Structure formats: C-alpha cells, structure tokens
C-alpha cells in the first residue's frame, strides 16, 4: 500500500508541474496577477509531493519491501542499513527521482528568494522550470518508475552493485 502512495505522490507532483508550467505563463501573457501568483504555491506543493515520494521509497528500502521491483533489484536482507539507504539513488530509477527532487528544491529556492523581482518575471521563470519538471516527471512515471511492483514478492533481493558498496561513495 505504501509504494502506491509514493506513486500517487509522483502523479500529484506531475499535475502540479503541469499547472505550474501553464497557468503562470498564460497569466504573464494576459497580465493576470492571480494566475501568475499560482507559480509559487505550485512549486511548494510539487516539492512537498516529491519529497514524500522520495521518503516513501527510502522507507521501502529500510523495510526491505521486495514487492517494489526497484528495491528487489538493488537490495537484499544482508545489506547494511547504510547501503540500503544509499541504494535509494544507486540505480537509474532512484537517481532520476533524486534528480527531480533536487530540481524541485531549486524551484522552491527560486520561488522563495525572488520576492524582490517583478511578478511577471517570477511567473515566467517558474513556468519554464515547471515545463522542465513536466518532462522529467513524465519520463520517470512512464519509463523509469521506482514504484513498479513485483508480485509475488521475492523472498530475497538481488543486491546493490558491489562497486557502490564503499563508504566513500
């Protein structure tokens, strides 16, 4: 059930990214302050849902939920906790989710620290950042979903790439 919540949080983040990429740009074109003001709140919401999704994936690794294909392919019951947590970004799907989360964090930074700029400029910048998020989130959900299920769940996972099992990484 919990991995479905992570997937649902990704879908909600995508919906907010679509709103962030369209309404503020349309509002800037029509000089509608209300539509432009939506940019900041959608940026905050998108970050919140992506953070929730990332934390749910991390919890799946900690709890060794092998019904999640990404967890089953990159962890096992003998893997130490430190490597289970770092395995979250140890392969394609997790690193892409981390990348989208970092992108959303930068979007929040732009939204938070651009108060002195004209609203039209902020709306255009956040709108373009929304389009970038839409692209990455669509790619994540359609081709690299870290919450794909593996049913029935195996009793043991495959293990993290041995090259990544180093304290320096």
Segments predicted by a language model, with ranges:
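Polytopic transmembrane helical bundles with strong interfacial aromatic enrichment
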Residues: 1-169
């Amino acid at each position: 059930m919990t991995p479905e919540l992570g997937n649902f949080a990704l879908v909600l983040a995508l919906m907010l990214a679509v709103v962030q990429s369209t309404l503020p740009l349309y509002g800037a074109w029509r000089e509608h302050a209300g539509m432009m003001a939506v940019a900041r709140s959608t940026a905050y919401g998108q970050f919140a849902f992506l953070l929730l999704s990332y934390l749910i994936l991390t919890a799946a690794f900690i709890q060794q939920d092998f019904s999640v294909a990404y967890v089953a392919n990159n962890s096992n019951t003998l893997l130490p906790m430190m490597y289970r947590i770092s395995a979250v970004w140890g392969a394609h799907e997790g690193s892409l989710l981390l990348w989208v989360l970092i992108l959303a964090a930068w979007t929040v930074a732009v939204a938070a620290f651009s108060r002195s700029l004209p609203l039209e400029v902020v709306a255009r910048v956040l709108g373009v950042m929304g389009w970038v998020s839409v692209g990455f989130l669509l790619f994540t959900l359609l081709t690299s979903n870290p919450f794909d299920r593996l049913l029935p769940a195996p009793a043991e996972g495959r293990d993290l790439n041995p090259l990544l099992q180093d304290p320096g990484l």
